[in-house]
Regions:
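Exported/periplasmic ABC-transporter solute-binding proteins
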Residues: 1-37, 42, 51, 58, ...
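Central helical "cap/lid" subdomain
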Residues: 81-87
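Short beta-strand->alpha-helix junction loop in the catalytic core
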Residues: 93
């Protein structure tokens, strides 16, 4: 495929990839391969929380491929004005990472009076609002547990606009299974009714939601990571090639759960 598309007024054309942190390891690996194949159009990778990435794309940030941690926000924030469809490329689940924590003792560890636990910013990152959703769903597992987790004095991460690098360290962290597996650290798997992994529990998950801003409230769904090519992509054909290479990667080997489908118009066609 010829990716040498003319770009008026620029001598250093790049393929701009905006990617969620959960996909960064895969994207970095693919960038090296892409750059070797296409030195005329190297990939410029920008990682961030998916809500923030979508806001950047809508505001005019160069974006040829957008890889989101959550398909729902692509649908709700970008379609149909900024994108016509997307590929779901993997599933995942929420777990808790930390020294000595496991599936048998996570309640005890997190509810200890001196425990501290954190997550990403829920107002900009699906990993953050999914952690909050997991806590909200804790009542489905054990009534009263949601409030004890959400309002625990050691719960860190609910500040809306924290200064960069200001978040305190914590003993435990709510994160994705794929990231936990890659880290090599101890982690606890949560009950399926909390971990947002089971498509059969979609109706249960949908009982909770989170407002990321005044205009967008996200309803909990089984985790689906997704990829789109915005209408504003400058390098449309190259974006399709990069996206196809990404979709062909072995995501299960990287700790992701198998899940794949197309919603709306296939951006690769």
């Amino acid at each position: 495929m010829n990716t040498q598309e003319p770009v008026s007024g620029t001598k250093d054309a790049k393929l701009h990839i905006l990617c969620a942190g959960v996909s960064l390891m895969l994207v970095r690996m693919l960038k090296d391969q892409w750059d070797a194949l296409h030195p005329e159009l190297p990939a410029a990778v920008k990682p961030a929380g998916s809500v923030d990435l979508i806001r950047l794309c809508i505001a005019g940030e160069p974006c040829d491929v957008l890889i989101s941690a959550d398909d729902a926000i692509l649908r709700d924030m970008m379609m149909p004005q900024y994108a016509e469809g997307y590929h779901i490329w993997a599933g995942n689940k929420i777990v808790v990472v930390g020294e000595g924590i496991g599936t048998e003792n996570w309640e005890e560890k997190l509810l200890a009076p001196d425990a501290t636990f954190k997550h990403h910013n829920p107002f900009g990152d699906p990993g953050g609002y999914r952690a909050v959703m997991a806590m909200l769903l804790a009542d489905e597992y054990k009534p009263g547990l949601s409030e004890r987790l959400l309002y625990h004095p050691g719960h860190i991460g609910m500040e809306k606009n924290p200064p960069p690098g200001s978040q305190r360290e914590a003993q435990y962290e709510f994160t994705y299974y794929s990231g936990a597996k890659a880290s090599g650290k101890s982690f606890a798997e949560l009950p399926a009714v909390m971990d947002l992994s089971d498509t059969k529990l979609a109706d249960v998950y949908a009982r909770v939601c989170f407002a990321v801003d005044d205009e967008n409230t996200v309803t909990a769904t089984p985790i689906a990571h997704a990829l789109t090519i915005p209408k504003t992509a400058v390098h449309q054909e190259a974006a399709k090639e990069f996206a196809g290479m990404f979709l062909a990667l072995d995501k299960e080997a990287a700790g992701f759960l198998p899940r794949a489908s197309v919603v709306g118009r296939d951006p690769l066609r």
